[in-house]
Amino acid sequence: MDIGIDLLAILFCVGFVASFIDAIAGGGGLITIPALLMTGMPPAMALGTNKLQAMGGALSASLYFLRKRAVNLRDIWFILIWVFLGSALGTLLIQSIDVAIFKKMLPFLILAIGLYFLFTPKLGDEDRKQRLSYLLFGLLVSPFLGFYDGFFGPGTGSIMSLACVTLLGFNLPKAAAHAKVMNFTSNLASFALFLLGGQILWKVGFVMMAGSILGANLGAKMVMTKGKTLIRPMVVIMSFMMTAKMVYDQGWFHF
């Protein structure tokens, strides 16, 4: 598939903007996947290429959070294992079953997340009581988070952040940091399976990854410096935008 320099430059910018937003609130796929589909590549290849570029951004943000000691891998290694396994299972299933019913339910889930953050203004302002241990979170919650990202994906960062705030008691910046490390883990599992299926356009993926790394690093810095004032409105806005796009794509308002 031949893609010119001008289009590659646009995709580089798309990767930058999407990963900047994704590092803060999730929802970067709302931007990158339509951009990839508009190049004319098949949907499966667009998803695989998106996982490649997203993995670069997620790794960049994760390394930044690790350097700043916002995340301790010794605390969450068990969680990450189950996120990886859940994502692998979701990626395998998405290639073999009909997801029409799930797609119709998804806008309500994403909208609920946005409304929850909107109407609980003090949620995540500071650390709260931890409701689940890391072990129980890993066993009971992580497989579903990974499965969702591998199976479908939109809003994964917001869902992971919400889980960290409500179940692990994290403040919003800490939740966003842990969500990004989990997101990298789930992306890695999905990428490996798309790689085995040959569904990656490498040139496009690497160009977008370069932009993604820069955008994610900047977004991660914003989380650490302006997290409390920035994350909540970004999560709400991205949740509403994702809901609107999914509703439109499903033809709810086509007459």
UniProtKB/Swiss-Prot annotation:
Q: Which InterPro entries match?
A: TM_pro_TauE-like, TSUP
What keyword terms does UniProt attach to this protein? Cell membrane, Membrane, Transmembrane, Transmembrane helix, Transport
Which terms in the GO cellular component ontology are assigned?
Answer: plasma membrane
The domain of life for this entry's organism is Bacteria
According to its record, how does it sit in the membrane? Multi-pass membrane protein
Pfam families, per this entry? TauE
> Where is the protein found, in the record's own terms?
Cell membrane
The membrane-spanning stretches of this chain are: 7-27, 28-48, 76-96, 99-119, 132-152, 153-173, 191-211, 235-255
Give the protein family.
Answer: Belongs to the 4-toluene sulfonate uptake permease (TSUP) (TC 2.A.102) family.
List the PANTHER family hit by this protein, alphabetically.
MEMBRANE TRANSPORTER PROTEIN YFCA-RELATED, TRANSMEMBRANE PROTEIN YFCA
Name it.
Answer: Probable membrane transporter protein HI_0198
Q: Which organism is it from?
A: Haemophilus influenzae (strain ATCC 51907 / DSM 11121 / KW20 / Rd)
